[in-house]
C-alpha cells in the first residue's frame, strides 16, 4: 500500500450478483509437491521489473526458471493481496489496517458483510474466522488507493474483470488446511522482533509498537523504521492463529530470517516445513520506507513504467532475492523430492488506469521443466489453487472459481530440466 487515498464514489453497483465460495475439490493437473517456498516482493508492476537493468537477477531467473507473463494481482492494498494468496479471498478486508489482536467481541467483516476500507477509515481488522460474504472486487478502484488528483482511479486485475462478492466464504488459510492434515507451514518474516509476532504491527527487528520504552526515549528509537509490517504477515489476521489452540497453527509458525529456527538456519539444516511463506523486510522487498536511507526511499513516481523508480531500491531487492534463492538452492531439501520456489510481486505501483495490476511471477521447480514462458491468464487465486493441488488439499474460496486455472504448464514434471541445484542463477 502507498499513501492514503481521497474518497470518491464506489463502483460496486456495476457488479453481478453474489458468488459462492468455500472449500471444493482437490485441484488436478499439478504434480505432488513436497516443499513450496513463496517469496513475496512488493509494489512493482510487470513492466517495471522485466527488462529493468537494476534487476539483473530477477530477469535472468525469469528466463532460466519458468515465468508467468500474463499474471495479475487481484486488488489493492497490500494486505488484500496477501490474504488472497494464502486464503483465496479478501475476507471483506480492503485496507492495510492492523489486526484487532485477540478481540473476541468484534464481528468479522465476513459476518457483517461490511467492507474494511481506508476511505472511509475503518477500525482494526477483527480476527477472521467463520463463514460469510467477502467484498466484491470492481474492475476499477475509485476509492482506496487514489492518492493524487492526477490518479483518479487504479485498476484491479486487468481493469476489465470484476469479481462479485462470494457468500459462504470460509475464514481460513492454506495454513489451517495444512495443519488440519498434519502438514507443516511457516511464515518467515525478516526483521521480526525477538519477542515474536503477537501484537506486533511494525518493528525494526528489535524495537516495535509494543516495546515499553523508557522516558525520554533512547536516541535510536526516535524514528522507528518499519522494516517488519504485520500487513505482510497475513496469517496473523486469523483467529485460529491468534488463539493458537492447535500448536501447529499458531504464533509458533512465525519466525525471522536469522537465529534459532529462523529461515537461514532451517534451510541449512533441511528442517523446513512443507509450505514456507517468505516476506523480506520493507527495504528488501522493494516496497521502500521514507526514513531508512536513500537506498530504501520510495519510488519518486508511480507511472507504471521504469521512469521515476528508485534504482537503488530495485537493486537492493534484487540482491535480497538472489540471496534467498541461493540459500534455498543450497538447502538439502532442494536436492530431493518435488520442491518449488515461487517469486511474485503482490501488486502494481498504483499508477493510474489504464495501467493494469499485472505483476511478474517466477516458478522454479527442482523436478521438471524449465525455461517455460507462459502466456496463460493467471492470478493470485491460480497460485493458491496450484499449491493446494500439489499438497492434495481442496481448493479454498475464490481458488475454486470456475475461471481460475491451475498453473500446470509452470509446474509440469515432464520434459528436460537444467541442473540449477547449485544456485547458479545470475552468478
Describe the role of every protein-language-model region.
Residues 9-18:
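Bacterial N-terminal signal peptides
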Amino acid at each position: 500500500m502507498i499513501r492514503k487515498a481521497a474518497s470518491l464514489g464506489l463502483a460496486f453497483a456495476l457488479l453481478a450478483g453474489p458468488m459462492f465460495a468455500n472449500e471444493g475439490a482437490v485441484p488436478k493437473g499439478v504434480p505432488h509437491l513436497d516443499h513450496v517456498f513463496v517469496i513475496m516482493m512488493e509494489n512493482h508492476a510487470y513492466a517495471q521489473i522485466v527488462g529493468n537493468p537494476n534487476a539483473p537477477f530477477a530477469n535472468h531467473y525469469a528466463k532460466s526458471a519458468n515465468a508467468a507473463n500474463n499474471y495479475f494481482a487481484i486488488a489493492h492494498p497490500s494486505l488484500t493481496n496477501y490474504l488472497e494468496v494464502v486464503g483465496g479471498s479478501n475476507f471483506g478486508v480492503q485496507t492495510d489496517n492492523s489486526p484487532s489482536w485477540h478481540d473476541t467481541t468484534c464481528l468479522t467483516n465476513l459476518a457483517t458483510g461490511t467492507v474494511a476500507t481506508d476511505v472511509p477509515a475503518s477500525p482494526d481488522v477483527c480476527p477472521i474466522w467463520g463463514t460469510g460474504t467477502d467484498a466484491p472486487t470492481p474492475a476499477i478502484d475509485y476509492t482506496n488507493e487514489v492518492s493524487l488528483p492526477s490518479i483518479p482511479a487504479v485498476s484491479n486485475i486487468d481493469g476489465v474483470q470484476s469479481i462479485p462478492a462470494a457468500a459462504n466464504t470460509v475464514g481460513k488459510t492454506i495454513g489451517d488446511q495444512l495443519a488440519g492434515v498434519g502438514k507443516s507451514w511457516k511464515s518467515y518474516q525478516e526483521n521480526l522482533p525477538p519477542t515474536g509476532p503477537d501484537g506486533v504491527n511494525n518493528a525494526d527487528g528489535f524495537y516495535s509498537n509494543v516495546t515499553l520504552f523508557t522516558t525520554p526515549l533512547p536516541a535510536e528509537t526516535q524514528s522507528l523504521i518499519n522494516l517488519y509490517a504485520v500487513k505482510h504477515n497475513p496469517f496473523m489476521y486469523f483467529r485460529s492463529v491468534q488463539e493458537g489452540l492447535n500448536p501447529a497453527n499458531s504464533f509458533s509458525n512465525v519466525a525471522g530470517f536469522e537465529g534459532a529456527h529462523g529461515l537461514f538456519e532451517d534451510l541449512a539444516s533441511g528442517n523446513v516445513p512443507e509450505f514456507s511463506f517468505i516476506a523480506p523486510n520493507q527495504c528488501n522487498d522493494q516496497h521502500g520506507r521514507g526514513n531508512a536511507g536513500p537506498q530504501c526511499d520510495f519510488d519518486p513516481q508511480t507511472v507504471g513504467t521504469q521512469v521515476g523508480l528508485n534504482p537503488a531500491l530495485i537493486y537492493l531487492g534484487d540482491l535480497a532475492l538472489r540471496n534467498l534463492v541461493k540459500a534455498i538452492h543450497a538447502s538439502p531439501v532442494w536436492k530431493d523430492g518435488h520442491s518449488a520456489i515461487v517469486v511474485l510481486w503482490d501488486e502494481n505501483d498504483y499508477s493510474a488506469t489504464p495501467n493494469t495490476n499485472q505483476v511478474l511471477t517466477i516458478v522454479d521447480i527442482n523436478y521438471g521443466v524449465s525455461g517455460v514462458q507462459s502466456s496463460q491468464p493467471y492470478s493470485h487465486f491460480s497460485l493458491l489453487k496450484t499449491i493446494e493441488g500439489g499438497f492434495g488439499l481442496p481448493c479454498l474460496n475464490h481458488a475454486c472459481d470456475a475461471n481460475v486455472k491451475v498453473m500446470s504448464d509452470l509446474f509440469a514434471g515432464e520434459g528436460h530440466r537444467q541442473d540449477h541445484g547449485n544456485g547458479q542463477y545470475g552468478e
